[in-house]
Amino acid sequence: MTRDERAGGNVPTHGGAALVGFAPGLAEIAPYRIDDWGRYPACHMGPAKLWELRNRVQAAASGELGERPAGIVITHGTDTIEETAYLLSRTLDPEVPVAITGAMRTSSDEEWDGPGNLTDAVRVAADPGSRGRGTMVVFAGKVLAGWQATKIEATALEAFGAPHGEPVGEVAEGRVEFTVGAHSCARRPINPPGLTARVAQIPMVVGDLGEMLDLARKSHDGVVVEAFGSGNVPPGAVPAIRRWLAEGKPVVLATRCPRGEVTPVYAFPGGGATLVRDGVIPAGPRTPSQARMELLICLSAGLAYGG
C-alpha cells in the first residue's frame, strides 16, 4: 500500500517485484520466483477469490507452476489474513510450508514494517524445520499456526496473535526458532470442490429477538452465532435458533470473548447447555470468524462441522 493523496487514503500499489526490491537480501536466504496473482484489498476477498488463491497455492506447491518449491510466501492485506490462513490450513497438504505476512504501515510511512515481515516470512518458508507445518502467519517476529492466527490489534505493529493457543515459533536475529512440534501447526486437510455453501455470522446483542437470524435463514446454509460469555444468548433469540435447526441447518455457537471457548454450563432459557441440548454445536477453540470458515469449508465438502 501507498498513500494516494488524490484518493484520500492508502491504496494497493506494489507488485511482487517491487516488494522484493524493498527487501534486499532475500536471494541470500533462498532462491525464489515471483507470482503476481493479484492486488486486492483484504476486505475484497470473498469466497470465490479465496478459493482461487487456494488453488493457486496448491498448484505452486505441487509443482504445476514450475519447480516444486521448498516453501511459499504470500503477501496479504491484514484485515482478512485470518480467513485466508484458516482456509489454507484446512484444505492444503501441510508438507510444503506456506508463510503468510503483510504490513501494518505503508511504504509511504517511515516505520513501514513490510520489508521486515517479508524477510521473516521468507526465512520461515525456507527453513527445513517448517516442513510439514502447513500454513503459518509470520508477523512482527512471531510465527503462528494458520488455523489459530487472528488479528488482535486494529493498528498496532504487533497485530496478530493466537487467542486459543500460543505462537509456534519466532524469528529473531535472522534465525527461525520453533517452540512446538510440526503436529501443532498442521491440520488434516478437507477437500471441498469449492466454497459453495453460504454461512452467516451473527452477533448477539442485549435484548436480541432473533430478527437477523430469521432474515439470514432464508438465504444461508448454516450460521455461526456470536454469543455472550461461555455461550449464552437472549431468550428472545432462541425461537429463531430453533427454526434454523428445524430446517436441518447447522447452528454453531461461538463466543464474543477474545479468549476462551464456549462451555455449555448454563441451563436457563438461552443458556449454552439448553442450546446444545437443542442441537446447537459449540465452536471449539475458534474465534467466530474461524468458526464460520470451518463451517463454510465443511458444508461445502458435505461434512459435519469439525470435519
Set out the residue ranges of the language-model regions.
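Short beta-strand segments
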Residues: I74-H76, A99-G102, M136-A140, P203, ...
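A glycine- and small-aliphatic-rich helix-loop capping segment at beta-alpha/alpha-beta transitions
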Residues: T2-A17, T80, Y86-V98, G114-D120, ...
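Accessory alpha-helical/coil subdomains and C-terminal extensions
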Residues: G15-E28, A145-N232
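Internal gly/pro-rich beta-alpha loop/helix module
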Residues: I100-A172
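ATP/nucleoside-binding phosphotransfer catalytic cores, i.e., glycine-rich phosphate-binding loops
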Residues: G231, P235-G307
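Short acidic, glycine-rich surface-loop motifs adjacent to enzyme active sites
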Residues: E67-I81, S219-S230
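ATP/NTP phosphate-donor binding region
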Residues: M1-S62, P239, R259, P282
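Short Gly/Thr/Asp-enriched flexible loops that form oxyanion-binding sites at enzyme active sites
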Residues: I74-V96, V233-R242
